[in-house]
């Protein structure tokens, strides 16, 4: 039976490249000259932003978003934490969300059932497997999920006939 997987993943190499480009842009920007501001990537899951003030953190957030979009990473996978300020400066943690959570997977399954397509969906950990009798039904399911607006980026893997 034909099937495909619905996943929400971020390419770690592209994420590393985007953070490096954002750091390089900080070095060349006039408003960040002589300022201790930087992005740090931890384990491919958390990006730490640090700067002397919260205003500069907001500017850095715009730089990070632009670099991620330029590298083809959907910014809906980012979860911005609170800006922590003290006398030494300001910091913010940005979490990169990977995988589809149980609640969101149930919403995807409900969306497929609501459309009354001839497909079945199963939740497998942090992915969703969709199976159907015909390839056309699966392509309709992909089109439906692409058109639906979810708060996380979706990719479609393992399309098998």
Swiss-Prot record:
Residue ranges of the TM segments: none
Keywords for the protein's UniProt record, in alphabetical order: Nucleotide-binding
Keyword set includes Methyltransferase: no
Domain of life: Bacteria
InterPro entries: DUF520 (IPR007551), UPF0234-like_C (IPR035571), UPF0234_N (IPR035570), YajQ-like_sf (IPR036183)
Keyword Nucleotide-binding: yes
GO cellular component, one term: cytosol
GO terms for MF: nucleotide binding
Primary role: Nucleotide-binding protein.
HAMAP family: YajQ
Family: Belongs to the YajQ family.
Record-linked NCBIfam families: PRK05412.1 (NF003819)
Name listed for the protein in its UniProt record: Nucleotide-binding protein XCV3791
